[in-house]
Swiss-Prot record:
Keywords: Hydrolase, Protease, Repeat, Thiol protease. The lineage of its organism: Eukaryota, Metazoa, Chordata, Craniata, Vertebrata. One of its GO terms (biological process) is type B pancreatic cell apoptotic process. SMART domains: calpain_III, CysPc. The gene is Capn10. Belongs to the peptidase C2 family. This is Calpain-10. It comes from Mus musculus. Its EC number is 3.4.22.-.
Amino acid sequence: MRAVRAETPARELFRDAAFPASDSSLFYNLSTPLAQFREDITWRRPQEICATPQLFPDNPWEGQVKQGLLGDCWFLCACAALQKSQHLLDQVFPPGQPGWSDQKYQGFFTCRIWQFGHWEEVTIDDRLPCLAGRLCFSRCQREDVFWLPLLEKAYAKVHGSYEHLWAGQVADALVDLTGSLAERWSLKDVTKASGQQDRPSGGEHRTCRQLLHLKDRCLISCSVLSPRAGARELGEFHAFIISDLQELRSQTGQGILLLRIHNPWGRRCWQGLWREGGEGWNQVEPAKESELLAQLQEGEFWVEEEEFLREFDEVTIGYPVTEAGHLQSLHTERVLCHTRTLPGAWVTGQSAGGCRNNSCFPCNPKFWLRLLEPSEVCVAVLQRPRRRLVGQTRALAGASPAPVNLPGKDYQAVGLHIWKVEKRKISLPRVLSAPPVAGTACHAYDREIHLRCELSPGYYLAVPSTFLKDVPGQFLLRVFSTGKISLSAVRLATKGASPGTALPAGEWETVQLQGCWRAGQTAGGSRNFASYPCNPCLPFSVPEGAGPRYIRITLQQHCRLSDSQLHPIGFHVFQVPADGENQDACSLLLQEPLLSCVPHRYAQEVSRLCLLSVGNYRIVPSTYLPDTEGTFTVTIATRIDRQSIHSQEMLGQLLQEVSFMAVMKA
């Protein structure tokens, strides 16, 4: 998305025609509870809302996020990451923009949003949705601070409307605001039935210890997907911010881990043991109780580790980004200073092979990854939304409230697997039949999936896939590494091929043989000449298996299409008799060929698709005239009719998006 050029007449404030102050910017199809406010929402500029508007406050807490009527807590939690890093905030909200008291102020601001591999500038006017003269969506703790509602408007413009921000994943917003990666860690044992987990297992406790280590380096969010009975005050499908973690000792010497939770609603909602005046504080010294309670700001509360693991469902952690723009590992703190990205696509009938349960898995897009040194590597597959988020047609005329069903929120279940290979010329079926060195646990309905691994130097084959075959989609493959890397797409050999030479659908194993025609030695010409047996005689065989095999034989001469030295070429295929293994080439070539690719043609490449039974064969490539010199490659592609790879690929659960809005529930 390109920034809108804010060229306005003197003394006239900018009005964004691409995202106007109207219902078309508020709603997509009136499918959310926002529809009930349709007649009451007005648009005002900050100087019409308060006397002295400012972008950022002197006190950082006064700029903290606070949720309004819009169910976009997932986005607001990600915005909190910007407050932990000034260089990230400057990246998203470029400094030096004229404010309301500046003579250069013209009524517009520019933000940057990371979209599918690029930072895109988004310019908006500063007219904001209001109810009764106050901001009705996001706001800061001090309502005369406007960086947050302006950024929210820019994000809504990217998505097409404010209503499109209703429900989402914190991880997606973190990526859009930082360009980094984000991980989602489940706090529940997925092998247990929902709602029946009374005490967390050891793995979840280790997660909390990891969070304690990460608290100063990253944004950490936590979500409630389905609150337990007795904890309904947390809401359902709601996201929170973990502001702090404190490890302390009880009066009896027992270790206690407390987590400080910030609710974007802006009010305290927790009635657990560690609420103000709760029984949990009896375990610590009164001075420590006073110290920790004094740290609480509006909308914050303390939760003990056991309560946290019982009441919350998952945490989301954003990878730290250095001032140089490099990601830092969540697991080792090492800087992933080498980055490579490449786009790709799953095309129905061509490269949408599905998961490894399908025999057409090898048809999926494939990428070469080369490591020059031992490295920690993160490889991610980011899906492009199925719709263009901007400039879409909105269904507002005569619309009535309906169940929330916003397009673009659903993504395909995708996975990623990586194989170590010895070199770039490989037998693809053989490689893919072996266990991968790294792979996702299952195909997940995430916008972006990724895996982290420690890899040794060498070549690797990375294959992203959807769970179902023939499902179209576009993606961006991103690789982050501590060591030097190279990334390239595996290209099919289609140079010079005509539409008729394309391989039929299926799995093919390819072998290439190279040779040359030399005058007086191996340039025997066509079968019209007695010197024909002097031509190169290339052996190949059709192995035993399930009957005859389809074979595509292609002869390519090594010269440019525009080269005046293009020779007429062709080839014949001879079958070796079962008892003729020791038969010399000369006597074999005096027999009639089994099949031919003639007449000889002035072409860079000629080919023939045939059905051959099990046995041994000889291919004889030739030019039409004897003593015509040149070099060539013969490619033999054999169709493999193999059974499905029994890899027992699993399908992840559908994502629960967080959106809960407290004001309307209250």
